[in-house]
Every structure is written in C-alpha cells, then in structure tokens.
Amino acid sequence: MRITMKFTKMQAFGNDYVYIDAIHQNITNLPELARFVSDRHFAIGSDGMVLICPSDKGDFRMRMFNPDGSEGEMCGNALRSVGKYVYDHKLTDKTELVIETLGGMQHLNLTVTDGLVSNIRADIGEPRLNTKVIPVNTNLDQFVEQPVEVLVKTFHITA
C-alpha cells in the first residue's frame, strides 16, 4: 500500500493510536488503512487508527478503527488524545469540547499551559461491565476484580 498522508502517533495510558486529520485530508479505504498502519512489523504500528472529522452534532467527530479494520464505538484514551490533538494543532481554541463518537456525544474539558494541552478531563459516563456487551471470554455476567494469572504473577482486573 502506498499513500501520502499526514498523521500523528500519540500514546495515552498505554494505548497508542495513529491520528489523522480527516478535515483537511481525504482519507479512503478506512478498514484497509487501519489494518496497514496498525501493523507493528511492516508499518507504523499501533492499537488502531483514529480519524478526526467534522461533525454536525458536536465540535468534532472521532472515528476509531481497531487493528483488524473494524470500527469501534469509543475509547476514552483515544478520546482524550483527540482533545489534545485538535487544540495543539490549532483546529480549535475552545477548552470545552463535545466530540461525536459511535458511542454517543462525549464531553472534554482541557487544561492549557503555555499554549498546549496539559490535562484533559473526559466525562464518558458510567462504565459498562456487562460481559455480553464487551468482549470478555467468561461465563460471568460481570468481570470485576477477577484474578488473572500472567506468567507467574496474578493480577486482579476489571473488564
């Protein structure tokens, strides 16, 4: 695949995504592009791709694609990074933003220090803990503080 585009790779709490300004660039073949840019061996490598798009409902629209090319509803870490991206790249001067996602309208409050975003607060609502709604391979209805052994260490996780 050969394309020319401008992108930014950002990381938030361990999630790294490729962010693309789809306001000023025409981006096509989104599932294929997401699979390509996410490949850690032959491309940029990431947990997925995020497009920053215009919105009729909010300040911006976030489209998030998983490494397999499927479009996801929402990711809080990606959402906060979108807030930083749009402010730091001068797409907005607002410090309170409404971002349209497949998961609904999300609200961000940005703290700016010396002209750059230094902190972001996101109100993404109550966590969804129903294992039938989120992809968790378990027979439990909720996966809360459950022991998971990784190598020789046990972690208690909530998913």
Where are these regions (language model features)?
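Active-site proximal loop and beta-alpha junction motif in alpha/beta enzyme cores
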Residues: M1-M74, L79-A159
